[in-house]
Amino acid sequence: MRVEWSQGSPYRYAWEGGGLRFVGQDRPAPVNYGLVEGLLNPADGEEVDAVYLGPPLSPGEEAEGLLLGMVALADGDHKLLLAQSPEGLDPQEAARLLAWFSPERRPTLLGPEEAGAWVKSLKERQDRRLGAFLGLAVGDALGAQVEGLPKGTFPEVREMKGGGPHRLPPGFWTDDTSQALCLAESLLQRGVDPKDQMDRYLRWSREG
């Protein structure tokens, strides 16, 4: 977990691009709060949030711990519960943590089995997405050598040779993969935003 908000502090930060950005002040956090880098939550398209029990940790610090459970929220933006020891929360600590979230989000504490199953499902989902894009890029690069040629006018493609109308080196993908990546980034960062999608296509066309 990467700490963005220290336990007991009103100062909140966001971890972006390998560094901290100051967000502002809020009521003091009852726990250390941050994110799990590289693990995305489809509920908001952002990296999974986590809370870390124990003494305050510095913003930007990387902390590892045991998965004790999670705070499940109605909007799907669940928070993993981490700690160095397996003791977990006492009833008063649990009540303070749940009270930190608005009642409309219906915060509920779940155990390590439920939390582990959720994390596993997220990783499997990411693996499928990565596999889809990897398959797209490999197939695109493999077919670049015969792009635009009518079926039956070329021998069976069995190796990565490159060439084709764009004279690409072996292993290079075409505009198909490039524009698919533009679309994926737009959907992740902006949701369904046709203007943002078109802006990215135009920027790719001009700048590559």
What are these model-derived regions, one by one?
Residues 122-208:
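Structured, active/binding-site neighborhoods that engage oxygen-rich ligands
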Residues 1-124:
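Hydrophobic N-terminal alpha-helices or hydrophobic patches in metabolic proteins across all domains
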